[in-house]
Amino acid sequence: MGRWPGGTREKVQRAALELFADRGYGATTVDDIAARAGVSARTVFRHFRDKEEVLFGADDELGAVLRDAARSAPPDLSPLAVVHHALDALAVALGPDRDALRRRAAVLASDVALQGRDLTKQARWTALLAEELVARGAPRGTAELLAATGAAAFRATYTAWLTGAGDGGLQERLDTARAAQERAWTGPWRGGGGSRPGPRS
C-alpha cells in the first residue's frame, strides 16, 4: 500500500485496516472508517470512491512506478535485468511497513471478491511490464514469458516476506530468491554429474 506518512489519506487507510482486522471487511462501513480516522464520511469519499478503494487506491500509482522503472532502465540491460530493475522499484514503493502490508493481505484473504480484484491487478501489471519489454525491442513471446515469470517470482517472494519471521527487507529477499533461481536454472542435474539420468530399463 506504500509508505505511511501522516496525511488524511494515510489516516483513513490505517483506520480502515484496523477496522477490517477487528470487525471484518463486510461488517465495516465507510462511516465506521471515518469515525475511527477522526474525519467525516465526506472526507473519506474525497479520497476514495468506496471502502474497497481504500485497499486498492494505490494500484495505479504502483503500476506507474513499475512502468516508469522499466521505461527508464539503462538501454544496455537485458530484458531479464529490466524486469528485475522494475520489480525492485516496486519493492521500494511498497514501503517497509510489513505489519500494514500483512494486515492488508489478511483482509484480501478473507474475501473472494477482493482476491479476484487483486489477481486482476497482478495480471494488469504483468501485461504492462511485458509491453515495456516489447517497446525496448524484445520479441513479444519472450517479453510475456519474462514478465510472467518475474512477476510470479516476485509474488512468491513477497508472500514469503510477509508471512516469514526475521528483520530482512523485501529487497534482500528478492536478491536471495534470484540467486537461488539462478543456481536452480544453471546448476547440474540433481547436484551432480551435469547430465540427466536416462530412462530406467
Identify the residue ranges that each predicted region occupies.
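Amphipathic alpha-helical packing segments from all-alpha helical-bundle domains
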Residues: 112-136, 144-148
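Hydrophobic alpha-helical segments that form the core
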Residues: 108, 140-160, 173-184
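Basic, helix-initiating cap at the start of DNA-binding domains
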Residues: 1-23, 27-39, 56, 65
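Alpha-helical DNA-contacting segments of helix-turn-helix folds
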Residues: 52-62
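Residue-level detection of the helix-turn-helix DNA-binding "recognition helix"
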Residues: 35, 49-50
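C-terminal peripheral helix-coil segments that are non-catalytic and often amphipathic
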Residues: 166-201
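Short hydrophobic/aromatic patch on the recognition helix
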Residues: 40-48
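Hydrophobic alpha-helical connector segments
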Residues: 64-106, 110
